[in-house]
Amino acid sequence: MARTQNPVVIIDTLRTPIGKRNGGLSTLHPTDLLGLVQKAIVERTGIDPSKIEQVVGGNVSQVGAQSFNVTRTVWLSAGLPLTTACTTVDTQCGS
């Protein structure tokens, strides 16, 4: 397998607060919550969004309206570059 000239670099990570059923975050749609995280990382790092090639976001129990690629939808609705690849991972607890 050939080595790539462009290594993968993780610039920053950030997570949302842990919520509970009918808690303070229950009225906030998952895309709005993830949008706050994505925007905060772009602002915090000062990176040019056009330089970001891949975004990975996590979401628990994607059903119904959430069953699409939430990370991609959030990225685009925030007005960030169409050229950025986005992936949503189902991040259920293993306990």
Residue ranges and their predicted role:
Residues 59-95:
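Conserved catalytic cysteine-centered active-site region
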Residues 48-54, 83-85:
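Short acidic capping loops at alpha-helix termini that bridge into adjacent secondary structure
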Residues 1, 45, 64:
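Short, flexible, glycine/charge-rich loop motifs used to bind or transfer phosphoryl groups or to couple energy/partner
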Residues 31-46, 70-74:
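Short, well-ordered amphipathic alpha-helical segments that serve as non-catalytic structural scaffolds
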Residues 9, 53-56:
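Conserved beta-strand elements of the Class I
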Residues 1-31, 40:
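Condensing-enzyme catalytic core mediating Claisen C-C bond formation in acyl metabolism
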